[in-house]
From Swiss-Prot:
Reactions the enzyme catalyzes: chorismate = isochorismate
Name under which the protein is recorded: Isochorismate synthase DhbC
Top-rank taxon, per record: Bacteria
Keyword RNA-binding assigned: no
Family according to the record: Belongs to the isochorismate synthase family.
UniProt xrefs under InterPro entries: ADC_synthase, Chorismate_C, IsoChor_synthase
A matching Pfam family: Chorismate_bind
UniProt KW keywords: Isomerase, Phosphoprotein
Organism listed in the record: Bacillus subtilis (strain 168)
Modified residues (Phosphoserine): S271
GO molecular function, one term: isochorismate synthase activity
GO BP annotations listed: biosynthetic process
Amino acid sequence: MLDQNVITETKAEHLLHEYQPGAFFLASPHRVLLAKGICEIVPEADGQNQMETLSGRIAEALRQAKQSGQSRPLVVGAVPFDQVKAARLVVPEEVRWSGPLQFDHEEKEQQAGHTYHIKPVPEPEDYKNGVEQGLARIADGTLSKIVLSRSLHLTSPEPIQTDELLRHLAQHNSHGYTFAADVSSQEETSPRRTLLGASPELLVSRMGTQVVSNPLAGSRPRSNDPVEDQRRAAELLSSAKDLHEHAVVADAVAAALRPFCRTLEVPEKPSLIKTETMWHLSSVIKGELSDPSVTALELAAALHPTPAVCGTPTDLAREAILSIEPFDRGFFTGMVGWCDDAGDGEWIVTIRCAEAEERSLRLYAGAGVVAGSKPEDELQETSAKFRTMLRAMGVDHI
């Protein structure tokens, strides 16, 4: 179990500023984790489905770390969207904790330090055509929901400073989950690749027997006009389409958690949460484990991927995504987090994120498509979601 005594006197801001590429960083509303070095690497599985044996491979890595002298080992890293792709998980050599980030000043709007060449993949019109394909599969009854995403490929003449980018993300998103994880290929000649972002969505947290999940579905872009901003929030909360989209996700999360829980509290209706750029419909689902040996990773594996990032039915939606989207999602819409040898852990949905490699960045954003969705609206929603990363980079618009 995570011992609250390991929450040190170190200020969270110090851990943020100590982060360097190659380390693991996760700031949640409750704590900050900085992990460095590699004691053990969780190996890839031999079979096609990497998730099937992931819990066992993590348990073995933790056991090896204990034999090496670690008293309270934990695993950190990221799991991709596609279950046939390998996760990037390690037992770090050094782990430091603190309380949550609490900035005593508001950061000024970030100015762009680089000039970027930006290429959308797919092009906006092609993305809208993809939404039409998704709507056709909904209309013929194949799917009830599909989440379709697009990407921005940014290149710069200068190396990407991921440590600076992480600090900007954290200062603008202190109420969510800011993360950075090394997802480099294990081949020695490969360049370093870093997954970083600021997600508002908790896939699952397990502390002792207490379980929490916070699915989000249904959203609106924020407005700089306070009156218009509140109008959009109220409209979202009363939108039949968005309430239906949210109910599909919340019901699926509850159904996945129920077999593990002695009790489960599911809100009758969603509430609103906000980030700097978006309004979201949110349901905080809380439960108590019936079997205390079930780990945070096992719960996360049962939930991943939720309809919030994939669709329903899950397998058919995943197949449609692979057919419609012209790129590999990588770790986008996967999960990032940690799990210790007692089973405690936090796993975050990897949205509002990018993968950085040398002088390039790949940003990702998706939108849920259900009956009644309009392609232009979904395009605008993805544009709004890109703003989390773009603002941290000092890019006003694309």
